[in-house]
Structures are given as C-alpha cells and as structure tokens.
Amino acid sequence: MSDDNRVYIFDTTLRDGEQSPGATMTREEKVRMARQLETLGVDIIEAGFPAASEGDFQAVSAIAAAVKTPVVAALCRALASDIDRGFEAIKGAQRRRIHTFLATSELHMQHKLNKTPTQVLDMIEAAVSHAASKGVEVQFSAEDASRSEPAFLVAACERAINAGATILNIPDTVGYAQPAEFAELIRHLMTTVRGAGGVTFAVHCHNDLGLAVANTLAALHAGARQAEVTLSGIGERAGNASLEQVVMGLNTRPNYYNLTTGIVTEELFPSCRRLSGIIGQPIPPYAPIMGRNAFAHESGIHQHGVLKDRRTYEIMTAESIGRKGAVVVLGKHSGRHALDAKVKELGYALNDEELLVVFVAVKQLADRKQRILDEDIEALILEKVLRRPDRYALQFLSVHCGNVELAPFAVVEMQVEGQTVRHYSAGSGPVDAVFNAVCQAVGRKPDLEEYQINAITGGTDAQGEVTVRIKDGTATTVGRGVHDDVIMASTLAFINALNRLAKKEEERTCPQL
C-alpha cells in the first residue's frame, strides 16, 4: 500500500481532550500519557497551548523532551507572540510543528474577531509566514470551517499554503457537519485550492451531534490524510472524534477505506485505561470498543453464535485492541519477580521503590481477595504510585452506621498542608457523613455533582472504584478512589478530587478549533 493510503493520527488528548470538564492533568501526568501515546504509535502529539499559562508552557516543554518518535505540536493563535512562545516550548523536540489557527466563518469573524475577511486573510498570511520562519512544520486550521463560506475557505487555504503551511486542517468546530456534506467539502477543497497537491489535508471533528467519528471517516474516505482525535473521544462539550473508533473503523473495513495507520492496536485498551485512571473518569460500559459490554453477549441467540464462532457477533477480537482480562496467579506467596513481569506486561515501568509499594499493596489485597486480576494490579499502580502528590491526606477513618436511631457519623484524621486535623460529622448516610467530616477538615465545601461506584472485577470481594465530580465556584474536578471497602474508596475519591481542585492551575481561556 502506497504512502497515499497512509493516515496520520494527530492526537490532541493532552490539549483539546484536557478541556473536557474535570479532565485536567498535571505536567507529570501529561508526560506519562505522552509516553503512552508514543507507545501507541500516534504520529503527532498536540502537547498543549504554551501561551495560555506558564504551567502549560512547562508541560509542553516536558513532553517535547520526553518523546522521540512523534511530532510534537504546539497550538498557537495567529499572533506572533503566541508563535514565539510555542516555538520556545517545542524547541527541545526531535520533530516539531507549530499549529496556528484563525476562524474563517462569517459568524466568528464578525462577532468574535471583529475583523473583516480581508483582515483575516492578512492575519493568516502573517501568522503562517512567521511560523514557517522558525524552520518547523506549519499547520494552519480554519476554525469553524464547516460553517464558513466555501469560496472564502478556499481563499484562506490558498493564503496559508503560499505563506508556508504544509498541513491544512478543516475543523468541524461545533459538530455541525453531516458526513456526506463534510466529505464533499474536503473533495471541493482538494480539487479547488491552488497548491492543494503539495499539502496534507486534516480534519478535526467535534461530537455535538454524535457524528465526530462518522465525519472523520467520511473525510478520510474523501481524501483527507490526517485525523485529529482523542482517546475515548474526550474533549470540549460533547467531545472529539475517538481515536480508537476511527482507527478500528479503518482496520475493520480495509476493503472499503483501503487506508492504514501506524497505530499499534494492541495498545488501544491500555492507553484508554491509562487515561481513565489519570483523569478519574471511568470508561462507560457501553462505550464502543473500550466499554466492558463491548465483548459481552446476553441474548441466548447471540451467545449460541459466539460459542460456535465469535465472528458471528464480533467484528474484531478483544485481543486485537489489547483486552486480555487474564487471571493473574498472584497471592500471599507470590514473589516480586512475578509482579514485576506482570507490571511490565501491563505497560508500566516502575523503579524498585515503586515496585515495592505495589508489591506490599498486592499482598495486603491478597489477604482479603482470592484472585488478583490485571485490573486489580493496574488500579493499585494508579492509586499507590501514579497518584499526584497530595495537599490533603487521610490518616484515619472511622464510620458508624446501622438501623439504630443514632444518625450515621464519621471521624476523620487528616494531614492538611502539613498539619494534623481531626473532625467528627454526622450525615444522612455514611458517605454523606464522611464527606461532611472531610470538608470540615480541609475548610472548604464544594458541591458534589456526581457519584459513581463500579466494581473493578467480579465477586463480592471485588475492589470498588468510586468516581466523584465536585464543583467549587466555577472550577470542576473529578476524583477517583479504589479500595475493597466502598466507604474507604468513596473517601479516597473525594479527597483526590479536593487535591485536584486545590492544585488546578490558574484559570485560562481555552482556544477552540
């Protein structure tokens, strides 16, 4: 298959994906995800928006230094100062790209930019030319392209090409496009824009109408060769096109698309699990490809067919996306070498000290649980090793509840910014009592917007995974806690969310595409 059939995967999980409410990541977490994206085989990592804040600049710089194979892209507004800042952030990368953008729809030009079409074209030329002078790849995105006048969009693309852009991105910024018309728009641009033969056309689709993946695949079928996607489809509002769905859409229909990617599909599930653990947002059970129901069959007719031949109701294998679900024979008498091998198989690189921490946790869990599964080990790694340093830490918890007239109450002892504090509080139930006591200890009272419990594995001795979403003012964060005691898991999740809230970087204006 020729290079003309190669689709380049541009992952924007660390930039657009992070704009999903509650999905904020620290610099260290972004670096960990970037390394996993490199293992996954993505071609381009959009590391962030360096001009937004010093924290974003430092994160992009750290990612640029950490990965070797992917191109590292910095998002910049069509401003020389943004482009200079972006270049400084990625200059340590082995392969670099400046991604600059400007809106081209009448709505955006008039009401957001307050610019005339002529002024916008001049800004595109100036920004792309300035970026090209840095000696790096230059990508231009026409924000809100799907609602732009086609003739003006052609003019904007031509101005960008003449100024030095080699990648033209056509975003469906608000998820407005329909697959057939979006494909036609791509074909129109590729046949009408002067110089189109020398550039790569890309698409960046949002999911407001649930069509992000369909629009992306339609555009690729029409000739676009770069797909801008995120793991699990996380992103602004209803999210972005899902990386795993786009890739497996191409993989399962080779005779239709005749397109390939460089993605190692066996790393898809580990990558989505890794992201889920970092941002504290569980993968929905009904999520295509990644959800726990994706390879489950309840109907008797379906079960009969699958038992005869899995291809009757499965269009891909669980193994092809890295879902193994194997039982790990680890327990009280297992050694560190066995654990080390399993940790590496799961895709984690732990030093001796970190491995010891997980080993002790596995031993403790084995005292309470008969079988230790892959999911258990990964949950312990995320909980014990990869959790961000905490401003608030739980030291002691006691909860009383029952069917007596005494209201449920909780006693917590915590480290709060280096000081030990102890508080008692009652509540309408044990979880409410714990949350009230924790709030008193840390001195803040956020609103609890969401509370979810999931069993990581089956059985009455399964570890419970609790996810909470809290809001304090305009700031929203998600926390995650894992324990075989649901009350303890709930407490850990709430404290994790409070830590994320406390460490959230200064508010910044996030760009749209």
UniProtKB/Swiss-Prot annotation:
Annotated catalysed reactions: 3-methyl-2-oxobutanoate + acetyl-CoA + H2O = (2S)-2-isopropylmalate + CoA + H(+)
Free-text function comment from the UniProt entry: Catalyzes the condensation of the acetyl group of acetyl-CoA with 3-methyl-2-oxobutanoate (2-ketoisovalerate) to form 3-carboxy-3-hydroxy-4-methylpentanoate (2-isopropylmalate).
Location(s) in or outside the cell: Cytoplasm
Complex formation: Homodimer.
Name this protein carries in UniProt: 2-isopropylmalate synthase
Keywords: Amino-acid biosynthesis, Branched-chain amino acid biosynthesis, Cytoplasm, Leucine biosynthesis, Manganese, Metal-binding, Transferase
Gene name of the record: leuA
Cofactor: Mn(2+)
Species of origin: Solidesulfovibrio magneticus (strain ATCC 700980 / DSM 13731 / RS-1)
Family affiliation: Belongs to the alpha-IPM synthase/homocitrate synthase family. LeuA type 1 subfamily.
Domain of life: Bacteria
SUPFAM superfamilies: 2-isopropylmalate synthase LeuA, allosteric (dimerisation) domain, Aldolase
Region (Regulatory domain): 393-513
Organism lineage: Bacteria, Pseudomonadati, Thermodesulfobacteriota, Desulfovibrionia, Desulfovibrionales
Biological processes per GO annotation: L-leucine biosynthetic process
